[in-house]
Amino acid sequence: MRASREGKHISGGERLVSEEKIEEAVLELLRKALTHENGKPDFINIKIEKIDKVNYIKALPIKTITCKNKKEAREVAKKILLEEGIPEEVVEKAFKIIDKGGMRGAAILNLNGERLEPDRERGVRVKNIDTSERLKEKILKEGLGTERTVDAIAIASKVIRLGIIAELCTSDNKSYTTGYVATKKGYFRITNLKNINEPGGRVFFVKDIDEELIKRLEEEAYIIDL
């Protein structure tokens, strides 16, 4: 599902479900589009597509880091990214990208800070993903995160599995200030990674990228499990 107003992205989402659950999933996504805090859309697109092969992989381990404010949170995020070999100036460029917001997908930065996504407005959209019911239940019941964590862990686990070095993300929900950094070491939820009413965004860090990897990010189907 993708929802927008006057061409500006408002919300998106997707599910990977069995045939008998399609109607339930469509209604859930429609409700999300119509009630999103970023505003009422004038355009909603819901696409239903048959998937022949689904990959099942384990979720990245989830760790929450509580920070007092945005400055502290950014330092924590930067430290995690620096440990993955990402230069400080590239991290700072990524912060500027997510703070600008407005992209439907992810920006892609190499270690020289060059933007590599083919379409800078669209970005690269990671699709055909979902979490298993038992993973969702574990996250919510054990207080590991929120519904947004359930959605985000699917993206993070898939992209790291496919060879992305790291991901930096803040939510496009204006009131949700917890963001995350994902690496092969885990999914790090970081509170106050942005301020209330600020936009959000997503950046993937790579050594290099080609059409084949972009295709896999966008098209290969993954269900994330325990």
Curated annotation (Swiss-Prot):
It catalyses: heptanedioate + ATP + CoA = 6-carboxyhexanoyl-CoA + AMP + diphosphate. GO terms for molecular function: 6-carboxyhexanoate-CoA ligase activity; ATP binding; magnesium ion binding. It comes from the Archaea. The keyword Nucleotide-binding applies. Keywords: ATP-binding, Biotin biosynthesis, Ligase, Magnesium, Nucleotide-binding. One of its GO terms (biological process) is biotin biosynthetic process. Its EC number is 6.2.1.14. InterPro entries: BioW (IPR005499). It is an enzyme of class 6 (ligase). It holds the Pfam family BioW. Pathway: Metabolic intermediate metabolism; pimeloyl-CoA biosynthesis; pimeloyl-CoA from pimelate: step 1/1. Disulfide bonds: none annotated. The keyword Hydrolase does not apply. Its cofactor is Mg(2+). Homodimer. Catalyzes the transformation of pimelate into pimeloyl-CoA with concomitant hydrolysis of ATP to AMP. Belongs to the BioW family. This is 6-carboxyhexanoate--CoA ligase. It comes from Methanocaldococcus infernus (strain DSM 11812 / JCM 15783 / ME). The lineage of its organism: Archaea, Methanobacteriati, Methanobacteriota, Methanomada group, Methanococci.
